[in-house]
Regions:
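Transmembrane beta-barrel strands of outer-membrane/channel proteins
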Residues: 127-133
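Acidic, small-polar-rich N-terminal luminal/periplasmic segments of exported/outer-membrane proteins
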Residues: 1-120
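Gram-negative outer-membrane beta-barrel proteins
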Residues: 65, 133-135
């Protein structure tokens, strides 16, 4: 079944320098995020609220229609700095993802971990900085 898919690559995610996954997804207008407390939000695709939009992290469902209808705040729990890519599938994806994906799917893929090779000590890190002003 053909459908519209938008993919955010690792480079696009890093260049966006978003503070939350909600900010990341609204930067390019991929979907609407209904803002709530602490910068979180409920994703909305084509008028479907978050209970009808499936959120998936590494092929594991983050929300489930059984638990609650209405606004869900699961999108704030994803840190953009751990993401390798994000796929936004618009429209019904019930065939591939089940009945929870009536409005669409937001599929997050995390980066692969860096593992040591035996006796060597492995140390790495990264940093990013942002500046903001109210004026």
């Amino acid at each position: 079944v053909p459908q519209q898919v938008y993919i955010l690559s690792r480079d696009q995610i890093e260049r966006a320098n978003a503070q939350t996954a909600a900010d990341l997804l609204t930067t390019d207008g991929l979907l609407t995020v209904q803002k709530s407390q602490q910068g979180g939000g409920s994703p909305m695709i084509r008028g479907f609220e978050s209970s009808r939009v499936l959120l998936v992290m590494d092929n594991v469902k983050m929300n489930n229609l059984i638990y609650r209808a209405g606004h869900l705040q699961n999108i704030i729990t994803v840190d953009p700095s751990i993401l390798e890519r994000v796929e936004v599938l618009y429209g019904p994806s019930s065939v591939s993802y089940g009945s929870d994906a009536l409005g669409g799917v937001v599929a997050f893929r995390s980066k692969n971990p860096v593992l040591g090779d035996g006796g060597k000590t492995l140390f790495s890190g990264n940093a990013f900085m942002r500046y903001g002003s109210a004026n």
